[in-house]
């Protein structure tokens, strides 16, 4: 699933391709992608102009005139790309926005898990999925005091805690494994048992890792591509994710992989301390 750095990269690369364009027609080939009534969705967006694209957590927010916002969640495999309207439809293309300038934006999703929800601008934070999201890394809301207080109330393990989007949004399996390794914390550690100095280090590593991953245009380990069809660069910097069975770059111990709440989790059994 695209995490915050990937979704932000999609936003940055997609914006110059579609900003200012007006929708002339919409083709919906797989209606379940649309949360609204598909006919109403088409009616409201036809002749509307894209003003800009914002993002919150893993959600893209397409801003239109007349106070409309399309909330788009890419889920596991969703991708946007600009094409000519006469380009043959791809097998996994499910929604097409044809613009008045003769170009078209298509949404491609192998698993069909992505969703688009048209709402009134200003109400998007009340929509399902977004309304319970916690703060993003590298924001004023995500400060050290907030993070310390949040962890002190959690009995569950730190891996599941960091994946909880109500605590901090935008982190997924890849970056959680990476920040826990950098912080030398075992993924099964009790969140509330981690020492204060280690929590501070973890907080700093979350912010730094997300910032660097975003600068590197995200991580491509499976199918992730930006709006220009280009891969990310952070996969070259991964230390544990995808490296189970290899030597830890810090101590040489063989990295292990376990399941944590059904999620594959790679860690160093020597470097990463288990706090109970």
Curated annotation (Swiss-Prot):
Pfam families according to UniProt: Fapy_DNA_glyco, H2TH, zf-FPG_IleRS
Membrane-traversing stretches: none
Catalytic residue positions: 2 (schiff-base intermediate with dna), 3 (proton donor), 58 (proton donor), 263 (proton donor)
Family annotation (SMART domains): Fapy_DNA_glyco (SM00898), H2TH (SM01232)
GO molecular function, one term: damaged DNA binding
EC number: 3.2.2.23, 4.2.99.18
Catalytic activity reported: Hydrolysis of DNA containing ring-opened 7-methylguanine residues, releasing 2,6-diamino-4-hydroxy-5-(N-methyl)formamidopyrimidine; 2'-deoxyribonucleotide-(2'-deoxyribose 5'-phosphate)-2'-deoxyribonucleotide-DNA = a 3'-end 2'-deoxyribonucleotide-(2,3-dehydro-2,3-deoxyribose 5'-phosphate)-DNA + a 5'-end 5'-phospho-2'-deoxyribonucleoside-DNA + H(+)
Residues annotated to bind DNA: 92, 111, 154
Zinc finger (FPG-type): 239-273
Co-factor remark: Binds 1 zinc ion per subunit.
Co-factor requirement: Zn(2+)
UniProt superkingdom: Bacteria
PROSITE patterns with a match to the protein in the record: FPG_CAT, ZF_FPG_1, ZF_FPG_2
CDD domains: EcFpg-like_N
GO biological process: base-excision repair
Assigned keywords, A-Z: DNA damage, DNA repair, DNA-binding, Glycosidase, Hydrolase, Lyase, Metal-binding, Multifunctional enzyme, Zinc, Zinc-finger
tRNA processing is among the record's keywords: no
Function statement: Involved in base excision repair of DNA damaged by oxidation or by mutagenic agents. Acts as a DNA glycosylase that recognizes and removes damaged bases. Has a preference for oxidized purines, such as 7,8-dihydro-8-oxoguanine (8-oxoG). Has AP (apurinic/apyrimidinic) lyase activity and introduces nicks in the DNA strand. Cleaves the DNA backbone by beta-delta elimination to generate a single-strand break at the site of the removed base with both 3'- and 5'-phosphates.
Subunit structure: Monomer.
Record's protein name: Formamidopyrimidine-DNA glycosylase
Naturally occurring in which organism (per UniProt): Lactobacillus gasseri (strain ATCC 33323 / DSM 20243 / BCRC 14619 / CIP 102991 / JCM 1131 / KCTC 3163 / NCIMB 11718 / NCTC 13722 / AM63)
Primary gene name: mutM
């Amino acid at each position: 699933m695209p995490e915050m750095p990937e979704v932000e990269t999609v936003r940055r690369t997609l914006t110059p391709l579609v900003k200012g364009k007006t929708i002339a027609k919409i083709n919906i080939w797989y209606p379940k992608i649309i949360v609204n009534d598909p006919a109403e969705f088409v009616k409201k967006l036809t002749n509307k102009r894209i003003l800009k694209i914002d993002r919150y957590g893993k959600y893209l927010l397409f801003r239109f005139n007349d106070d409309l916002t399309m909330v788009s969640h890419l889920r596991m495999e969703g991708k946007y790309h600009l094409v000519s309207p006469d380009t043959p439809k791809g097998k996994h293309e499910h929604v097409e926005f044809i613009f008045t300038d003769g170009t078209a934006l298509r949404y491609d999703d192998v698993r069909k898990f992505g969703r688009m929800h048209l709402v009134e601008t200003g109400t998007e934070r009340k929509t399902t999925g977004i309304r319970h999201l916690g703060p993003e890394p590298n924001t004023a809301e995500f400060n050290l005091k907030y993070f310390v207080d949040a962890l002190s109330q959690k009995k569950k393990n730190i891996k599941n805690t960091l994946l909880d989007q109500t605590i901090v949004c935008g982190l997924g399996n890849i970056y959680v494994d990476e920040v826990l390794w950098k912080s030398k914390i075992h993924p099964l550690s009790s969140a509330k048992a981690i020492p204060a100095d280690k929590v501070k280090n973890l907080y700093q590593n979350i912010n730094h890792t997300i910032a660097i991953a975003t600068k590197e245009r995200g991580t491509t380990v499976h199918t992730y591509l930006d709006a220009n069809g280009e891969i990310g660069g952070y996969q070259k910097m991964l230390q544990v994710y995808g490296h189970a069975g290899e030597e830890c770059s810090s101590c040489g111990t063989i990295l292990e992989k376990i399941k944590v709440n059904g999620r594959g989790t790679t860690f160093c059994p020597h470097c990463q301390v288990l706090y109970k």
